[in-house]
Amino acid sequence: TGGFFNFWPTSLWDAAQYMYQQDYVAKDAQGNGQIAVSGHSMGGFSSEMALYLDETNYASTGYRIIRAGLSMGADYSWTSYLGLDEATAVATFGGRTVGKVCGQYDEFFFAADEPPTKSGTVYRKNYVATTAGKTLLEQENPQANTWYTCADGGQRIIYQPNEIHPWNHFSTASTKDAIEFYATAFSDQSGLHQSDLVLERDL
């Protein structure tokens, strides 16, 4: 596990800091970055850690680098070893737009209230109904695929597509969820003139 914990805890946070320094990355009037982080499985853990580390950094800098985060196929089971569980995550979301894609038949995660013996088996899970899901959405009876405005002013959602862990990479359901998430998170950025866009050029 030594190599495992050497990579993902800071990888997306490192990337976000690098991107923030680029002059083509938008910042608001207060210097907050208009950056979103997302990742699947281990990348999802890294996304969760990036939000946490960004909020820790905000305490000393006064600005946030990351505006939104969407993890896919990842809960807080591994980040908890680094002190980041659901309650800590909620306390450090800092008003950001935060979402999770939690496949109902994920083989590895989202069985928060189930006995450990069920880990690694394929059966239907309803993450929003678990203690963890309720904590993240700050609701007593949350529903999947539903936006909630939480105590810090940020919006949160848990998507629960009817799929297994690896499908989060490429399924039409997860792709739709990701597009919908970012359209919501950056809704105030719509209507940009084409001269304000930086596009890749085909060579």
What are these regions (language model features)?
Residues 1-199:
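Soluble extramembrane regions of membrane proteins in the secretory/endomembrane system
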